[in-house]
Structures are given as structure tokens and as C-alpha cells.
């Protein structure tokens, strides 16, 4: 894991982080108020946002990363090049989200994962 700053990211990664930041504004979190935004960039450069959506039964809630990947799939894309998770804490995806990411990474174990916090911390995984 590498710690960096927004300014040191490539223009493509900066655009991905900005999309995740915007997506976070649409998060539906009436129970935890833990808003998270995400964005995926496909192998051909398209970007798809996602945000977390809570349901009173938290087990049926959907994480931002999964929503971004499902948005990508809904638009006919199948290969993730990079993913950003943006929220108040470290952006390391949970095990379930990692499984969804793996399903759409074309067996590439080096998919770029960027964790960005509301405090400005950026982690590259």
C-alpha cells in the first residue's frame, strides 16, 4: 500500500476520485449516516459512479463499490481497470466487494484500487 496526495495522481485517477466524491453526495444512509461514494474506470476509459444505499435491514444494503460495478455492468461494460472508494475512513473494500471486483477484473490481480478519505488521505492498493 502506498500513501500519496491527490495532486500526485494521474489526471485519469483524479477524474475517478472526483466522480466518487460526487457520487457520495447521493448516498442514502438514514441509519448510519456513513456516506460512501465509489467510481470504476473500465479498460476502455469509461467511468461509472456508485454510492452506498442503506436499508433498515443492513444485510440487504448495498456498498458503493458494488453499486459502481453494477452500474458499469448495466451499461454493458465488463472489465474494471481501476476503482475508487471515497468516504470518511480508509477506502479498503470489504471482502464481498472484493469478490465483485474480482468477477469483473478479467483475472487481473493488479486492478488499481484507490482509497480516498474525506480528510484528503489517498491510499493506492
Model-assigned labels for residue ranges:
Residues 19-22, 64-72:
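Short, well-ordered amphipathic alpha-helical segments that serve as non-catalytic structural scaffolds
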Residues 51-60, 64-66:
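Compact, glycine-rich, soluble single-domain proteins
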Residues 41, 71-77:
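Alpha-helix C-terminal capping segments
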Residues 63, 67, 96-99:
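Short amphipathic alpha-helical face segments that pack within enzyme cores
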Residues 1-26, 75-125:
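C-terminal binding/interaction regions
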Amino acid at each position: 500500500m502506498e500513501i500519496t496526495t491527490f495532486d500526485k495522481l494521474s489526471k485519469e485517477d483524479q477524474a475517478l476520485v472526483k466522480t466518487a466524491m460526487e457520487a457520495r453526495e447521493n448516498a442514502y444512509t438514514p441509519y448510519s449516516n456513513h456516506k460512501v461514494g465509489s467510481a470504476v474506470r473500465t479498460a476502455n476509459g469509461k467511468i461509472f459512479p456508485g454510492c452506498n444505499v442503506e436499508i433498515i435491514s443492513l444485510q440487504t444494503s448495498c456498498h458503493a463499490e458494488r453499486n459502481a460495478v453494477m452500474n458499469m455492468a448495466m451499461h454493458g461494460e465488463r472489465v474494471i481497470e481501476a476503482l475508487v472508494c471515497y468516504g470518511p475512513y480508509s477506502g479498503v473494500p470489504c471482502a464481498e466487494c472484493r469478490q465483485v471486483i474480482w468477477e469483473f477484473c478479467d483475472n487481473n490481480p493488479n486492478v488499481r484500487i484507490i482509497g480516498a478519505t474525506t480528510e484528503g488521505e489517498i491510499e493506492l492498493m
